[in-house]
Amino acid sequence: MKKGTVLNSEISSVISRLGHTDTLVVCDAGLPIPNSTARIDMALTQGVPSFMQVVDVVTWEMQVEAAILATEIKQQNPQLHETLLTHLEQLQQHQGNTIKISYTTHEQFKKLTADSQAVIRSGECSPYANVIICAGVTF
């Protein structure tokens, strides 16, 4: 369910159509995106916009129930992993719910993206900077 205001019309449209348990992916510049999944390409150049900039805007716009990450982020990108977990903790407090965080292999993560409503590609160029965001409800 849509909660705020996003200037990008494609992102706004996708979020407004999300139902309970639908998923939306925010990814780095290198994640392969299935042809069958809508692509919203925000990448301008390396690092612009960053993964966390996109995650921040998207997650404040929607009700988040869960997040799925690749297990590899823990070892290969620990700083970003901690930043993302901190953001989700703050979001959880703001929303008044518990956001379930789960992990899967990167290979399985790539397969799960095919079931998402859309993949939003950031300009991030650091390893495993990807998250599947699961929509919740505001009631």
Curated annotation (Swiss-Prot):
Q: Which organism is it from?
A: Salmonella typhi
Q: What is this protein called?
A: D-ribose pyranase
Q: In which pathway does it act?
A: Carbohydrate metabolism; D-ribose degradation; D-ribose 5-phosphate from beta-D-ribopyranose: step 1/2
Q: How does it assemble?
A: Homodecamer.
**Subcellular localization(s) per the UniProt record:** Cytoplasm
- Can you cite an annotated GO cellular component? cytosol
Segments spanning the bilayer are none
Per the record, the GO terms for biological process are: D-ribose catabolic process
Q: List the disulfide bonds.
A: none
Which gene holds the coding sequence for this protein? Answer: rbsD
InterPro entries xref list: D-ribose_pyranase, RbsD-like_sf, RbsD_FucU
Which HAMAP family does the protein's record reference?
D_rib_pyranase
Task: Give the catalytic activity.
Answer: beta-D-ribopyranose = beta-D-ribofuranose
One GO term in the molecular function aspect is:
intramolecular lyase activity
Question: Which enzyme type, at the first EC level?
Answer: isomerase
